[in-house]
């Protein structure tokens, strides 16, 4: 029961962190807006809530001295996956903080990154400035407050990582994977039967008969070329 609960929490954290990563990549671009910043705020807060719940659940289980060896190995794998996910979340939050400070919404004089928007410069600039001025006051307070809150949350995530390492000592290099690299590509959950067959065919070894036929064909081709050169010289 505890294992399934931890897996569900970790799966939700992975999806939320991936969503946050894609949103961070658009900060400072032509799609940047107050709606994007608000969505970033909601997503990172959801990720932190899931991280706190996952950390508390895994910590309680791994600190149980009566845990069986096979169960402990499974929870240690979940712990390593959770630790890596938290590292990625912290890195994306720091990136969002840097980009948010470099491209503030409350300072329209600082142009955003151009990502393919085209048109007459005077008309585009006039429309952009008029639209910006209408929302300047509404966006200014949110932008500044969100950056301050994000800075505090980055420190909190860093403290969470430090506390994790102090409470539970699970070196990443001691945890062994249960599946070989790329084994998920053959899973019937993520791929249909036809995809599995094609992957198996492409992943199989070289057929000796085909290799021999290719060698013979190459030899015949070289002989034909040599014969053609000789005939050309004699003529």
UniProtKB/Swiss-Prot annotation:
It is a single-pass type IV membrane protein. It is found in: Membrane. Residues 29-54, 144-169 form a coiled coil. GO terms for cellular component: membrane; neuron projection; rod photoreceptor outer segment. GO terms for biological process: detection of light stimulus involved in visual perception; G protein-coupled receptor signaling pathway; negative regulation of signal transduction. Residues 232-235 are extracellular. Residues 153-200 are annotated as: SNARE-like. InterPro entries: RGS7BP/RGS9BP. It comes from the Eukaryota. The chain crosses the membrane at residues 211-231. Keywords: Coiled coil, Membrane, Sensory transduction, Signal transduction inhibitor, Transmembrane, Transmembrane helix, Vision. PANTHER family: R-SEVEN BINDING PROTEIN (R7BP) HOMOLOG. Specifically interacts with isoform RGS9-1 of RGS9. Component of the RGS9-1-Gbeta5 complex composed of RGS9-1, Gbeta5 (GNB5) and RGS9BP. Regulator of G protein-coupled receptor (GPCR) signaling in phototransduction. Participates in the recovery phase of visual transduction via its interaction with RGS9-1 isoform. Acts as a membrane-anchor that mediates the targeting of RGS9-1 to the photoreceptor outer segment, where phototransduction takes place. Enhances the ability of RGS9-1 to stimulate G protein GTPase activity, allowing the visual signal to be terminated on the physiologically time scale. It also controls the proteolytic stability of RGS9-1, probably by protecting it from degradation. It is linked to Prolonged electroretinal response suppression 2: A form of bradyopsia, an ocular disorder characterized by prolonged electroretinal response suppression leading to difficulties adjusting to changes in luminance, normal to subnormal acuity and photophobia. PERRS2 is an autosomal recessive form with onset in childhood. This is Regulator of G-protein signaling 9-binding protein. It comes from Homo sapiens (Human).
């Amino acid at each position: 029961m505890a294992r399934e609960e931890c897996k569900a929490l970790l799966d939700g954290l992975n999806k939320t962190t991936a969503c946050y990563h894609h949103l961070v990549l658009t900060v400072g671009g032509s799609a940047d807006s107050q709606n994007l910043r608000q969505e970033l705020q909601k997503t990172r807060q959801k990720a932190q809530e899931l991280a706190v719940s996952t950390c508390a659940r895994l910590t309680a289980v791994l600190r149980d001295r009566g845990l069986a060896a096979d169960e402990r190995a499974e929870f240690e794998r979940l712990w390593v996956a959770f630790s890596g996910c938290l590292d990625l979340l912290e890195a994306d939050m720091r990136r969002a903080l840097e980009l948010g400070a470099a491209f503030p919404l409350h300072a329209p004089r600082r142009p955003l990154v151009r990502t393919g928007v085209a048109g007459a410069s005077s008309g585009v600039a006039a429309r952009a400035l008029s639209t910006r001025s209408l929302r300047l006051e509404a966006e200014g307070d949110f932008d500044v407050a969100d950056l301050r809150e994000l800075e505090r949350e980055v420190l909190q995530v860093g403290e969470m990582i430090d506390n994790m390492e102090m409470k539970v000592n699970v070196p990443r290099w001691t945890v062994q994977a249960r599946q070989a690299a790329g084994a998920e590509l053959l899973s019937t959950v993520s791929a249909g039967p036809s995809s599995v067959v094609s992957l198996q065919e492409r992943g199989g070894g070289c057929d000796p008969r085909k290799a021999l036929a290719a060698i013979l064909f190459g030899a015949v081709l070289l002989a034909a070329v040599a014969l053609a050169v000789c005939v050309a010289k004699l003529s």
